[in-house]
Amino acid sequence: MARVAINGFGRIGRLVYRIIYERKNPDIEVVAINDLTDTKTLAHLLKYDSVHKKFPGKVEYTENSLIVDGKEIKVFAEPDPSKLPWKDLGVDFVIESTGVFRNREKAELHLQAGAKKVIITAPAKGEDITVVIGCNEDQLKPEHTIISCASCTTNSIAPIVKVLHEKFGIVSGMLTTVHSYTNDQRVLDLPHKDLRRARAAAVNIIPTTTGAAKAVALVVPEVKGKLDGMAIRVPTPDGSITDLTVLVEKETTVEEVNAVMKEATEGRLKGIIGYNDEPIVSSDIIGTTFSGIFDATITNVIGGKLVKVASWYDNEYGYSNRVVDTLELLLKM
């Protein structure tokens, strides 16, 4: 039985817990949560979700714990991870989902506290490995202690990049993620170090940065230096789409690109990348468990070598499923 703690019970932390609850894997037990607020608030936010709706179990709380279906989960509000009682609680894995402890030095604070491994739900620095399932999960090793799951956007497109590069050879490319707003934006016009993210999230189209394109090269090293991109934040709470345009070496057609991707989604990427051939919109993919859903209706090819593809993704729930998948892979080692 793996004992798991979740550090940061925000959008991703709560969904990771929900997915663990839904899967009912007998080998995983969430024993602790650390977040800088009170248990009443955490219980309410777990129970009610504006996007993913009401939690499927019974949620109660005490001063120092959450109680889900009668099972107690210890709750802490400690800003310094090195002071958390991971050793006393026998914590094997920490899901690091604060967005704060993203480099090796900070993530190691959990190890100092007694945890055995840390899974970071964001791009990281100094990690042992960045894992995107569908690309390089076979490189996970038992000795890895600090693991990054990259970003939701990287997960949405990297497996597709890998397939396209293997089949057609990517020369260069640009991606744009049209991304729902997140809590790293302001609800109203208020200060932010990114002056565009300082503007009201629900009433603006907001161009900003993404490291997703360059991060793809961490898991598909063959395209290192060949991709870049940007993000456009839009006034939706969840559901995003990554638009990728690449120049390829081998001439192709729309039909061939779609056939190659359909084969991949039914084979090695089954359950990771979905395939769509209907005129869907973003709300249609909320609650889907895929890292991305390849949209065959959007595929375009000009001159045989300029290829555009698109991948829908639930940037919260789909990504959180991959985090739990990564945890389950580590359990088997």
From Swiss-Prot:
Active-site annotation? 152 (nucleophile)
Write out the entry's keywords from A to Z: Cytoplasm, Glycolysis, NAD, Nucleotide-binding, Oxidoreductase
Q: Which GO terms describe its molecular function?
A: glyceraldehyde-3-phosphate dehydrogenase (NAD+) (phosphorylating) activity; NAD binding; NADP binding
- What's its EC? 1.2.1.12
The positions annotated as site (Activates thiol group during catalysis) read 179
- Residue positions binding NAD(+): 11-12, 35, 121, 183, 315
Binding residue positions for D-glyceraldehyde 3-phosphate: 151-153, 182, 197, 210-211, 233
A GO CC term attached to the entry = cytoplasm
Give the residues annotated as coiled coil. none
Superkingdom per UniProt: Bacteria
| Pfam families linked | Gp_dh_C, Gp_dh_N
| EC top class named in words | oxidoreductase
List the subcellular locations.
Cytoplasm
The record's InterPro entries line, in alphabetical order, gives: GlycerAld/Erythrose_P_DH, GlycerAld_3-P_DH_AS, GlycerAld_3-P_DH_cat, GlycerAld_3-P_DH_NAD(P)-bd, Glyceraldehyde-3-P_DH_1, NAD(P)-bd_dom_sf
Its function?
Catalyzes the oxidative phosphorylation of glyceraldehyde 3-phosphate (G3P) to 1,3-bisphosphoglycerate (BPG) using the cofactor NAD. The first reaction step involves the formation of a hemiacetal intermediate between G3P and a cysteine residue, and this hemiacetal intermediate is then oxidized to a thioester, with concomitant reduction of NAD to NADH. The reduced NADH is then exchanged with the second NAD, and the thioester is attacked by a nucleophilic inorganic phosphate to produce BPG.
Oligomeric state and interaction partners are given as: Homotetramer.
Full protein name: Glyceraldehyde-3-phosphate dehydrogenase
Q: Which organism is it from?
A: Thermotoga maritima (strain ATCC 43589 / DSM 3109 / JCM 10099 / NBRC 100826 / MSB8)
- Gene (UniProt): gap
